[in-house]
Amino acid sequence: MSQKIEKVAVLGAGVMGAQIAGHLANAGIPSFLFDISQELAEKGKETLTSLKPAPLYKPKNADLVTPCNYDDHIANIGEADWILEAVVERLDIKDLIYSKLLPHLKDSAILTSNTSGIPLTDLTASMPDDVKKRFMITHFFNPPRYMQLLELVRGEH
């Protein structure tokens, strides 16, 4: 299967989510950077130009990151080819986020988690089979721009 990734939705604007969105911007890929409030999403984007070491090749790359919140911008999920979840390492919170986004997920979208400790089978337990087929773990290491390492874990589907 070959699919071009033209837009990504990064769920979670904390340390990892914001830097992953920034690194996607370094590759010229626009993203929606989601968090529970618009303020947190904006703050995540702002950190891209202030963190050391710098997550962006050029500060202008931050223009490719669009801060979003789940209440006002959830429909943007439907524009994303890849939805990358990078929220806190709690299964109950991840499940809540998945339940919000699944109705907006386009049929060809890939859904992944940046988890480093929750088993894939636990993450997908309540997902429909067609989504399980498109789900995997994509664990970036911190800081993503400098740690050229990505752990990939696929499921049985």
Question: Where do the PLM segments sit?
Answer:
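Short amphipathic alpha-helical segments
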Residues: 21-23, 45, 95-98, 123-125, ...
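Conserved N-terminal Rossmann-fold NAD(P) cofactor-binding segment
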Residues: 30-81, 90-92, 96, 127
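NAD(P)+-binding Rossmann beta1-loop-alpha1 motif at the extreme N-terminus of oxidoreductases
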Residues: 1-50, 104
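Phosphate-coordination loops involved in phosphoryl transfer and adenosine-cofactor binding
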Residues: 4-7, 62, 80, 108
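Rossmann-fold dinucleotide-binding core
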Residues: 110-157
